Amino acid sequence: MKKKTTLSEEDQALFRQLMAGTRKIKQDTIVHRPQSKKISEVPVKRLIQEQADASHYFSDEFQPLLNTEGPVKYVRPDVSHFEAKKLRRGDYSPELFLDLHGLTQLQAKQELGALIAACRREHVFCACVMHGHGKHILKQQTPLWLAQHPHVMAFHQAPKEYGGDAALLVLIEVEEWLPPELP
């Protein structure tokens, strides 16, 4: 720690002489404006509504036609098949991960809906959904649910480093990002 320097008697007398006639300021603090909320903070009510809206697309009765041979994959008709190839090769690395282990089908649908809503809100293009092996219920249902959602562009069985055949890499269609307007 730095050693304090002491003033000589002469310097102290000079200081008192210079400060004679001054008075104490009543208030010398600056009041700052309250910080504005972060843009990414979303009210809880809105999050719950987004989650419910996103899980609305998942039906157990509708069975989309998916290729049953080879790895699990899907590409929306208006999306290039090259995107699925890039997913397979691991060109996209997921920014969000969802683990469905131990969830019921209803909970899994809600969590998938929340994941897609979060990806769109946070402008995340690629996510990983880990459904696991288990009794193969979620493993079979997850691709069927994802293929029904309009914001899912493509998905492919994940490479080994992201879970292999117990996980899917999902490409999400995100809105174009616009910077927030300043007040």
Curated annotation (Swiss-Prot):
GO terms for molecular function: RNA endonuclease activity; rRNA binding. Keywords: Endonuclease, Hydrolase, Nuclease, RNA-binding, rRNA-binding. It holds the Pfam family Smr. It is an enzyme of class 3 (hydrolase). Residues 98-173 form the Smr domain. GO terms for biological process: rescue of stalled ribosome. Its EC number is 3.1.-.-. InterPro entries: Smr_dom, Smr_dom_sf, SmrB-like. Gene3D superfamilies: 3.30.1370.110. Belongs to the SmrB family. Associates with collided ribosomes, but not with correctly translating polysomes. HAMAP family: SmrB. PANTHER family: DNA ENDONUCLEASE SMRA-RELATED, UPF0115 PROTEIN YFCN. Acts as a ribosome collision sensor. Detects stalled/collided disomes (pairs of ribosomes where the leading ribosome is stalled and a second ribosome has collided with it) and endonucleolytically cleaves mRNA at the 5' boundary of the stalled ribosome. Stalled/collided disomes form a new interface (primarily via the 30S subunits) that binds SmrB. Cleaved mRNA becomes available for tmRNA ligation, leading to ribosomal subunit dissociation and rescue of stalled ribosomes. This is Ribosome rescue factor SmrB. It comes from Shigella dysenteriae serotype 1 (strain Sd197).
